[in-house]
């Protein structure tokens, strides 16, 4: 028995010995992993591995010793967590001793020490012992890159786990690391080394007398000029090194006396990258420096920054110079002063003012903008700096404004003033008398009003912006100023005939200021706009078309623009609704465009109200019943043939009203939405008009029963309401409503009504929680679709229902969506519905604007397009190959729609298999297919040049053919693709260059300007192809 046990014990050790010999003598790498796996599984211990390696570790041949230690180190790297404390001690002593061995052995020794540096059982004191041994015995910079990286890893591991022990070394640790790093050149190692230096400083390791040495050993790499080689497998970018080194240089004020002269030297150099890096580093340093560090260098720093802003041709250098000046000023602003200390901020700003003030007064204004930018960069750093600069510069600029009489010069000066006014908004002042602008208030207002009344449009625009900024300063504008300002805004936004930009700016300013000064706008602007609306109504009654055509929309825009405060909304909303009602009571019916203009103004007011729950509910309960009352009255049977009905019930008008109702509903709280739904659904199902204003309607309102075609059209408004409700709002009589919608969706008498019903049904399906009721609704829909598609006059309506139900289910990943999509694919071969089915794929992949939107609380999964692509494109491709020739265009069209709306990262991996179909789609005679495919291919030319290069001959031929298409949109897209082709590898394109340049001469004479523009752009790129620097 004992003999058997001994044999069993010896057998595995024999195996271990064999693996060791295979590794050491056979130069095979596999046995090391096998030994490590056996140690982890418990078959052997680390001690047994050491014993098996005994002869190898003591072999007189260095290479054999190196292989033995390499095996042990590889095992330890995988099994260090299994080591006991006493094992770690012995191994550390062994490896430290081996650091004195032959240079061939050192790499393997370092790998072993790296493994031991990861041990949680490492006893106190051994980390210091290891690092001392490395610092003393190893000349790190003579090692290969990978071994130097190992040393940095050992240091990093010990700094992470044994910080206090290492700090006990004092400055010796810092000096040792300086010796390790000195002379490092490999970017992979530098990234780790910079991180170590940063930790040395940020974690308060002792630098002792070696501050300058540590600075020198890192700053010698500044500025970084590393350029990664092509196809660099390590992925290290120049920016990575720049940021790591910058973090080190800017980590301590103790580097300031050495770093700031270096930065000044590099800013003054001729190398653009060095200027940028130096200015950005200075910016970072200012976050940790104080006045003491900057004091001696401020004149030189200011001189360098001033020169760069005044003289540089690079916008980036100018921007970085201004940012550095801002940081310098901020640093000087936040330093705490002693009572007897010099105020460096004051003297620094005085120097800036001294060097810049006189440029503001030069007649040619050559250096006005650079000087203003410098002053504003300094002023934007702190409240103190802003006060100092503004109080010195504003009087000068105000004086200059009056000295110059030309509008362009005045505009420049006012823009500079505006820049300083904007800076004042950054700082708050408890006492309004302390505000620097208080003393200039009258002069600024005078200047602003002069600009607003100047005939120069550009000066007016700056005046409007100045008014907005001054108005944002609390208590700066008096009531008289506000009344005058409102009058100017009224004039500019309502009366000016020749400046669209001024009108837009005045409306925007009105909206901003109305939020701040609602009383002023209620008192001085709303009454004037109300009066204008009354004038419009009388013009409308007289059919005075030319008079009202331009004034009417401007008045409406002004009313909606100022509806940014709840108190103003309560005045403007009734005005707009009353105006809409009055328009429809006149003897002459308004035009469609005029009714739409009113609805668009209501839409903007609704959007403004979404910011405030109270205003949102006020708008909803005021506007929605009023709009419904208007259209319900217009849809009454006795008004079937009236002009009023024709306007209010037109598709465009109802679509605009639907948008207003949806916007007014999406932001309602569930409680308030429940109150509203309790009125609106019964209105459509039961004809309950009791909640509508002026509800003295003759006849009945029954859009789902035997109602007139006009009443059925109003289902579009029901759709807008119920499809915008929060998901947790319960809809009354839902079963009945879904049934009525289903019936109406397949009604052939009015396509507008049936489509609205189908969309409404789909919108409710999408939000309905999973369960038996949803399954019942879906079964009803499928039965209705199949019955309608089988035969009869309602096939088109049944198809529309199928399409919208499919989309509703695709968006929420419902299992039935796959079956419905297959049904849709089957219709691609249908002679009557095939083209519409192909276009249906565009709808399935697109975002809707009226129903099934995230804003309307629909369930829209974030990856629905990717999932649809994965599930259905293979079937589309198979269907294309199997389809008859006359049906293939439908499959191509559907496929093109899917691919065109697919995120490009999803499409790129599938491109090789799909590209042939896309190229075939370009030969399809359908211009929609051509345009969709071109739109899909253009970004692919930029993102997948290698794949596209394989088909360059076909691509060029097809693109050039389509550049002569009858469709302007196709011609433009084809020329854009010809332009994008130039991003393919140049050697692939050069053989085609003469042919393409000749062919692109023809569209240069195209009758459409936009086509000619694209042709010029594309031909120019082909001309440059292969030239030096292209």
UniProtKB/Swiss-Prot annotation:
Domain of life: Eukaryota
GO terms for cellular component: cytoplasm; cytosolic [4Fe-4S] assembly targeting complex; MMXD complex; nucleoplasm
MF GO annotations: enzyme binding; nuclear estrogen receptor binding; transcription coactivator activity
Keywords (A to Z) from UniProt: Acetylation, Activator, Chromosome partition, Cytoplasm, Cytoskeleton, DNA damage, DNA repair, Nucleus, Phosphoprotein, Repeat, Transcription, Transcription regulation, Ubl conjugation
Subcellular location: Nucleus; Cytoplasm, Cytoskeleton, Spindle
HEAT repeat start and end residues: 866-904, 908-946, 949-987, 990-1028
Record's comment on post-translational modification: Ubiquitinated; undergoes 'Lys-48'-linked polyubiquitination.
Modified residues (Phosphoserine): 1027
Any GO BP: chromosome segregation
Residues carrying N-acetylalanine: 2
Similarity comment text for this entry: Belongs to the MET18/MMS19 family.
Complex and partners: Component of the CIA complex. In the CIA complex, interacts directly with CIAO2B and CIAO3. Component of the MMXD complex, composed of CIAO1, ERCC2, CIAO2B, MMS19 and SLC25A5. Interacts with CIAO2B; the interaction is direct. Interacts with ERCC2/XPD; the interaction is direct. Interacts with ERCC3/XPB and NCOA3/RAC3. Interacts with RTEL1; the interaction mediates the association of RTEL1 with the CIA complex. Interacts with BRIP1.
Function: Key component of the cytosolic iron-sulfur protein assembly (CIA) complex, a multiprotein complex that mediates the incorporation of iron-sulfur cluster into apoproteins specifically involved in DNA metabolism and genomic integrity. In the CIA complex, MMS19 acts as an adapter between early-acting CIA components and a subset of cellular target Fe/S proteins such as ERCC2/XPD, FANCJ and RTEL1, thereby playing a key role in nucleotide excision repair (NER), homologous recombination-mediated double-strand break DNA repair, DNA replication and RNA polymerase II (POL II) transcription.
Name under which the protein is recorded: MMS19 nucleotide excision repair protein homolog
Lineage per the UniProt record: Eukaryota, Metazoa, Chordata, Craniata, Vertebrata
Record gene name: MMS19
